[in-house]
């Protein structure tokens, strides 16, 4: 697929580069990561030259990142031509096969670079791995908290490098990851296992390893959700969380990972729809707060990269202003990109009118557009080769990625209770498996030589899978029914390890922090003694004596 890229020369004029999928010379090959520009002077000069060619409407468009429609570029052509968006975000309904996504990405970039100023798109996705994973193909890694239990930055790097390779192969150049939130609230309904840990230093270390690997792979990394979403008991998708903690506590708990990532040069920071009154703004959520975005993030932390809002279709940011006003206030607060506005036309028109009327100065608009252009230049978007469908399919089935996912899962399994040494089970044992993930756990145990029975009576042990049992009476009753059989009960917690606080009397308790198949296989390997548990608790468990760093081994 031939693709045109308009690039400025340093004198301020433009040249038209022609790259093909199979050309000679210096043109990149399909799927190849392009050379990223590292000289800040070159980036600044080229960004300024591009900006000078853009119309006001094109500048405003760069701030918009709508949701994609359908599974083809053609279905989004009108949005590109009318609004000149800075990017799009993929969701599962847009993603079918590697070949289809590669073709869609190529088509979107062709449309964008052939329209107006010819600025390539950020094509993003929420691919945190684990619970928040959009790709229906490729290796499925465990959640971030599994990495927190494994305590190995190299495993975090492997996860991010594999993810970046999978994304780049299908033309996705931005990942809304990693989560830099410090999960200190056991009742957090939206973060939980998406967080590495309750320990700020460990969160920062693992998030930094992921950021470096994403960006080394040519994929934009996004630290989220500033100023911190780890101490909420309200989901900002459905309401506005209020975190009433002091500035001192915030600096001690929530700030360190973000400061570390800012210092490390993270490409992008995502704001949170949370209200933190003691940080200096009791009226607006962080996404709409000039004090928190411009004052704290930019001026105090020294961040000059791209700031994106969290999705603007979430209730946490829509409770006090209409959707057009939300978009305007986010820009005034210091945001550069408006993610998923519920009405693209309304957001575009509101920001454009605010600039035309002088409420948003054109200088302020230019600041955001320059940040966006600089990042697109640094990550090589202007000379990116088209995604190659055949290569994309190969990357999606790459065995090295699946092996890495299993290594992460194996290293994360945390044994928190083992009464009378019930684990490991003998390979001759008969086991009944029920609850969350029973089919996959049972199959893995059978593969290891244990006999898996459909009958609860007569089993040598009962394995019960849970996920969120702390807040689910039905799961608690299921464990009680297993205990009533008289056989030893082994719980495999596949969400947060907080389930142990409501299951204090089980014989053995394993935390695997993920419902991914590799985590269920890892649990079976530990139950059968194939692997010795080496994970350590990355959080404290309320109502128990178990806390950060605890974990048993064989």
Predicted regions and their residues:
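Bacterial N-terminal signal peptides that target proteins for export
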Residues: 1-11
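Second-shell residues forming the walls of enzyme active-site clefts
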Residues: 55, 75, 96-117, 131-133, ...
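Hydrophobic faces of well-ordered beta-strands that scaffold small-molecule active sites
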Residues: 61-68, 86-90, 121-127, 174-178, ...
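Solvent-exposed loop/turn segments at secondary-structure junctions
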Residues: 69-72, 94-97, 127-132, 174, ...
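Short acidic, glycine-rich surface-loop motifs adjacent to enzyme active sites
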Residues: 79-98, 176, 186-187, 262-283, ...
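A substrate-binding/cap region within the structured catalytic cores of diverse enzymes
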Residues: 145-172, 179-211, 398, 504, ...
């Amino acid at each position: 697929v031939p693709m045109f890229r308009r690039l400025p020369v340093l004198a301020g004029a433009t040249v038209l580069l022609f790259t093909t999928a199979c050309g000679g010379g210096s043109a990149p090959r399909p799927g190849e990561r392009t050379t990223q520009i590292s000289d800040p002077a070159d980036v600044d000069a080229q960004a300024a030259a591009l900006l000078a060619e853009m119309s006001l409407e094109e500048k405003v468009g760069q701030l918009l990142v709508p949701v994609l429609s359908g599974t083809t570029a053609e279905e989004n052509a009108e949005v590109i031509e009318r609004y000149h968006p800075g990017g799009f975000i993929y969701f599962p309904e847009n993603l079918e096969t590697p070949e289809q996504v590669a073709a869609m990405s190529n088509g979107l970039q062709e449309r964008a670079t052939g329209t107006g100023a010819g600025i390539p798109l950020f094509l993003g996705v929420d691919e945190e791995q684990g619970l928040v994973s959009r790709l229906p193909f490729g290796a499925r890694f465990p959640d971030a908290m599994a990495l927190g239990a494994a305590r190995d930055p190299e495993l975090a790097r492997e996860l991010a490098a594999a993810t970046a390779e999978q994304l780049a192969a299908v033309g996705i150049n931005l990942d809304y990851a990693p989560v830099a939130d410090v999960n200190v609230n056991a009742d957090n309904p939206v973060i939980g296992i998406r967080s590495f840990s309750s320990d700020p230093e460990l969160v920062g270390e693992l998030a930094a390893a992921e950021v470096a690997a994403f960006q080394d792979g040519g994929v934009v990394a996004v630290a989220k959700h500033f100023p911190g979403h780890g101490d909420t008991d309200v989901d900002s998708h459905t309401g506005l969380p209020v975190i009433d903690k002091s500035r001192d506590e915030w600096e001690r708990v929530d700030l360190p990972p973000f400061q570390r990532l800012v210092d490390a040069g993270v490409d992008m920071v995502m704001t949170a729809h949370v209200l933190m009154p003691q940080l200096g703004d009791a009226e607006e959520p962080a996404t709409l707060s000039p004090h928190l975005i411009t004052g704290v993030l930019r001026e105090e932390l020294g961040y000059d990269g791209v700031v994106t809002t969290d999705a603007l279709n979430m209730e946490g940011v829509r409770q006090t202003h209409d959707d057009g006003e939300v978009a305007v206030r986010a820009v005034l607060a210091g945001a550069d990109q408006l993610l998923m506005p519920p009405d693209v036309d309304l957001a575009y028109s509101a920001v454009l009118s605010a600039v035309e009327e002088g409420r948003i100065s054109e200088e302020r608009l230019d600041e955001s557009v320059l940040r966006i252009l600089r990042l697109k230049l640094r990550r090589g978007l202007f000379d990116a080769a088209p995604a190659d469908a055949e290569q994309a399919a190969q990357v999606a089935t790459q065995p090295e990625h699946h092996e890495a996912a299993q290594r992460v899962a194996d290293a994360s399994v945390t044994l928190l209770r083992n009464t009378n040494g019930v684990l490991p089970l003998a390979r001759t044992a008969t086991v009944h498996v029920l609850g969350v993930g029973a089919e996959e756990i049972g199959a893995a145990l059978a593969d290891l030589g244990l006999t898996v029975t459909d009958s609860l009576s007569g089993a040598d042990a009962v394995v019960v899978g849970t996920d969120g049992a702390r807040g689910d009476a039905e799961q608690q009753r299921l464990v009680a029914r297993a205990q009533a059989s008289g056989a030893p009960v082994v719980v495999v917690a596949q969400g947060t390890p907080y389930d142990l606080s409501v299951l204090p009397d089980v014989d053995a308790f394993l935390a695997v922090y993920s419902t991914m198949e590799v985590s269920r296989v890892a649990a079976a390997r530990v139950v059968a003694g194939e692997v010795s548990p080496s994970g350590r608790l990355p959080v404290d468990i309320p109502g128990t004596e178990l806390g950060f760093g605890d974990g048993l081994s064989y």
